[in-house]
Amino acid sequence: DDILYNWAKEMSAYVKSIDPHHMVSVGDEGFYNLGYQEAARQDLPSSAYSGYYGVDFDKLMTIDTVDFGTPHMYVDQWGFDLGDDDLEWIKRHAQTTSSADKPIIFEEFGLTDKTKRDAAYSDWLDIVTGDYYEGVEYQGFNYWMIASYLDDGTLYQDYDGYTVYGPE
């Protein structure tokens, strides 16, 4: 079904009709629509690649009024294997946007397992900054949640387990 695609096409065209110089993205998670059989054949997590959520990142990047890609990644929620599915996800999205001749920003990402987070974030940011795969580079990234100390000296509460804390 093309509900999300048609909506993104209509809304991005509307924004461009008001301000043709405004940069537009969809802000979606970046799920693919390869179908269940193809996702299984490629040994990819079916929920993120099968089309289950009605999102088709490849197709969204063909919209000429969408200027850049903004995938997200939450490995614990999506059942990704660290060191495999996560790296493929980041690489594949850069390849998709490169093929569409569009920039890409790793818009949101998180990992709640703090014993694995530093190493995983290091790997992910190596890819995002172009230090991992030849020809794969993002134009920027955002942590889902970055926080610091409050005025009273306590840390901002970690509501969902994804918060990264800055220095004091």
Describe the residue ranges of each PLM region.
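Extracellular glycoside hydrolase catalytic/binding regions
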Residues: 1-137
